[in-house]
Amino acid sequence: MKTISVFGVFVADLCFIANAIPEKGQTILGSQHIVGPGGKGSNQAIAAAKLNGRVNFITKIGNDKNGEMALNLYNALGMNTDSIIQDKNQSTGVAGIMVNEKTGDNAINIIPGAAGTLTNDDI
């Protein structure tokens, strides 16, 4: 079987669910908070692994709890993590996602963290 290599970003998704997305300067009460894996490249690699693909994911994460979440998930799916760099000086990226539970609309703020420092030399 051939290997599927995916180059991309892992971020920890911090989802905040409420009846609306707050407007500028507004504070609202939410109904739910969910933390889970995210990042477009990571999501593609996970999908390929769940379809029994042999996957190699290329990214950079921090040496922290969010990076640990990524590695635990990838290992559980049997993905090759040899191309994942853990940077002890950078944190793993995060995405703050506000979701309107009535409409499904969202607003997202992404901090790429370690993945934003990936260079050609790293690859």
In which residue ranges do the predicted regions lie?
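Conserved phosphate-binding/catalytic loop of the ribokinase/pfkB sugar-kinase fold
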Residues: I85-D87, I97-I123
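Short secondary-structure transition/capping segments
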Residues: E68-L71, V94-I97
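A glycine-rich helix N-cap at a beta->alpha junction
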Residues: L73-N89
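General structural feature for long, well-ordered alpha-helical segments within catalytic domains
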Residues: N66, A70, T119-D122
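Glycine-rich phosphate/adenosyl-contacting loop at the front of the ribokinase-like
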Residues: M1-K60, K65-M69, N75
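Short, flexible active-site loop motifs that bind/organize anionic cofactors or intermediates
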Residues: N56, V94, G113
